[in-house]
């Protein structure tokens, strides 16, 4: 009886210690996980509109990558450096309604910015770690996130 209580108590301690931790997100094959989101880079060159549409077709809830911290930006820079042929990618930040209000294509709030200048469509240049304005018809690789 004493051994059963000891084993039960040990299991309870382990359960309680793990219950506060975040579960690791199980991303589909080819996608990488970071902070409860999945990311994938594609070497397909697309303009901003086609890139966003492409991402929404990859996986339910997927959009062009949105960046909410310096750490997340570093993760995406590494993903691009290791997986894409070009040192830049579209990001989901743009003036979606042409009313001077910027928002992420996934409708997330803009809390973190590293803008080189204000623009309509933005591209992230990895070696400079800056976001730059680019005509929306420019073609660039794609990083999707869900």
UniProtKB/Swiss-Prot annotation:
Tissues of expression: Expressed by the venom gland.
UniProt GO MF annotations: metal ion binding; toxin activity
Pfam family, one: Lectin_C
Keyword annotations: Blood coagulation cascade activating toxin, Calcium, Disulfide bond, Glycoprotein, Hemostasis impairing toxin, Metal-binding, Secreted, Signal, Toxin
Location of the protein in the cell: Secreted
Subunit structure: Heterotrimer; disulfide-linked. The heterotrimer consists of 1 heavy chain (a metalloproteinase) and 2 light chains: LC1 and LC2.
Record's protein name: Snaclec coagulation factor X-activating enzyme light chain 1
Source species: Daboia siamensis (Eastern Russel's viper)
Designated gene of the protein: LC1
């Amino acid at each position: 009886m004493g051994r059963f209580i000891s084993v039960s108590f040990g299991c309870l301690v382990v359960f309680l210690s793990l219950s506060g931790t975040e579960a690791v997100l199980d991303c589909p094959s080819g996608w990488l996980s970071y902070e409860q989101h999945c990311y994938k880079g594609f070497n397909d060159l697309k303009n901003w509109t086609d890139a966003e549409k492409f991402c929404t077709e990859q996986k339910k809830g997927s959009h062009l990558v949105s960046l909410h911290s310096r750490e997340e930006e570093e993760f995406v820079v590494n993903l691009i450096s290791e997986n894409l042929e070009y040192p830049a990618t579209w990001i989901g930040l743009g003036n979606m309604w042409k009313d001077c209000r910027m928002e992420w294509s996934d409708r997330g709030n803009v809390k973190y910015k590293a803008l080189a200048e204000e623009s309509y469509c933005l591209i992230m240049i990895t070696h400079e770690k800056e976001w730059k304005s680019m005509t929306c018809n420019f073609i660039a690789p794609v990083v999707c996130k869900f």
